[in-house]
C-alpha cells in the first residue's frame, strides 16, 4: 500500500448511498481517491457523483446477490487495471431489533445475509485486486460486536461474527501484504436514525397481546434508551473522518474504536467481569 495519501489511489465502499457509507465515500474522494461505491438503494444516491466532482461512481448492487457482486467487482477491476485496488471499506449493513423469541427466523437470517455473508462475498471477490495493490480492507463492525445488547440480538451477533472473521482474514492475508482492520463505531447520528426508530415502532406494533405481556414493557424502555443514545452519538461526518484516518493509518491498526462511547465501552469490556458486564448491559439498554 502506497504511502502517498489519497492522490491517484482507488477505493471501493459498500452501503454508500446514504449515512456513514456516503460520508466515507465523499471524504475519501476529497482526499483524492477514485471511489467505486455500491448500494442496494438507488433513489438516494443520484447526487454522489456531483457532490464528489465526479470522483465517486455508484453501482446499484445487492451484496446478497452473488451475480450482482461479481458484475460490480469485475467492472471495478477492469477500471483499476493492473494497479489493483488500494482500499475496500465493507460498510453495508442493516439492523433488526426485537426480542429474539418473537423475531421471525427469516429476519435474523436476512441480517446475517447482509451483514456477514454479503460482506464476505464482496471481500473475497475483491481479493485478487487487493493482493495486486497490497491494499487494505476496513470492515465496519460495531461496539456491540464485543458488547451485545438485549433486543439487539441479530445485529450484535452479526457484528460479533465480523470480529472473528477479521482475525482470520488478517492472519490469512498477511503473506500477501493485504491488511485487515476492524472499525468499531459506537452510536451514530445518521439519516438512518429515523429508519431505526420506525423499525422499533413496527416491532412493538406487531406484537401479539401475549408477546406484549412478555416483552412490551421492557422493549419500550429499550426503544426509548436506544433512541436517546443514538441521538447523542457521533455525527456521520465525524465518524467518516475517523474511518478515513483508519484507512490511512501507518501501521494499520488491528481494531479501532470510532467515537468516545465506543472507546469507553470497549475498555470496560476488557477490564470488567462478566457479572459487571451483564449488569451494565441491562443498564445501557434502559432496563435497570
Outline where the language-model segments fall.
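SDR active-site lid
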Residues: 175-252
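Substrate-binding pocket helix/loop in short-chain dehydrogenase/reductase
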Residues: 99-100, 107-109
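Active-site helix of classical SDR
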Residues: 123, 158-161
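The beta1-alpha1 cofactor-binding region of Rossmann-like NAD(H)/NADP(H)-dependent oxidoreductases
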Residues: 61-74, 105
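Conserved glycine-rich cofactor-binding loop
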Residues: 17-18
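Conserved glycine-rich Rossmann-like NAD(P)H-binding loop of the short-chain dehydrogenase/reductase
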Residues: 31-46
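Conserved NAD(P)H cofactor-binding loop of Rossmann-fold oxidoreductase domains
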Residues: 91-96
Amino acid at each position: 500500500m502506497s504511502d502517498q495519501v489519497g492522490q491517484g489511489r482507488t477505493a471501493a465502499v459498500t452501503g454508500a448511498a446514504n449515512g456513514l457509507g456516503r460520508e466515507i465515500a465523499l471524504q475519501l474522494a476529497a482526499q483524492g481517491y477514485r471511489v467505486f461505491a455500491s448500494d442496494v438503494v438507488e433513489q438516494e444516491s443520484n447526487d454522489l457523483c456531483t457532490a464528489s466532482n465526479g470522483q465517486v461512481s455508484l453501482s446499484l448492487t445487492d451484496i446478497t446477490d452473488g451475480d450482482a457482486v461479481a458484475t460490480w467487482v469485475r467492472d471495478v477491476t477492469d477500471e483499476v487495471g493492473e494497479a489493483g485496488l488500494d482500499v475496500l471499506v465493507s460498510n453495508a449493513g442493516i439492523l433488526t431489533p426485537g426480542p429474539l423469541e418473537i423475531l421471525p427466523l427469516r429476519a435474523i437470517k436476512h441480517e446475517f445475509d447482509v451483514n456477514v455473508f454479503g460482506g464476505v462475498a464482496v471481500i473475497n471477490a475483491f481479493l485478487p485486486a487487493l493482493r495486486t495493490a497490497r491494499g487494505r480492507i476496513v470492515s465496519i463492525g460495531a461496539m456491540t460486536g464485543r458488547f451485545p445488547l438485549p433486543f439487539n440480538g441479530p445485529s450484535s451477533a452479526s457484528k460479533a461474527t465480523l470480529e472473528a472473521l477479521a482475525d482470520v482474514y488478517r492472519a490469512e492475508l498477511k503473506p500477501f501484504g493485504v491488511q485487515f482492520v476492524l472499525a468499531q463505531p459506537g452510536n451514530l447520528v445518521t439519516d438512518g436514525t429515523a429508519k431505526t426508530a420506525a423499525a422499533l415502532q413496527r416491532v412493538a406494533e406487531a406484537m401479539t397481546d401475549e408477546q406484549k405481556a412478555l416483552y412490551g414493557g421492557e422493549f419500550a424502555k429499550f426503544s426509548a434508551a436506544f433512541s436517546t443514545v443514538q441521538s447523542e452519538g457521533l455525527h456521520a461526518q465525524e465518524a467518516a473522518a475517523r474511518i478515513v484516518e483508519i484507512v490511512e493509518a501507518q501501521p494499520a491498526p488491528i481494531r479501532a474504536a470510532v467515537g468516545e462511547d465506543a472507546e469507553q465501552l470497549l475498555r470496560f469490556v476488557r477490564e470488567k467481569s462478566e457479572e459487571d458486564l451483564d449488569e451494565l448491559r441491562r443498564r445501557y439498554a434502559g432496563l435497570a
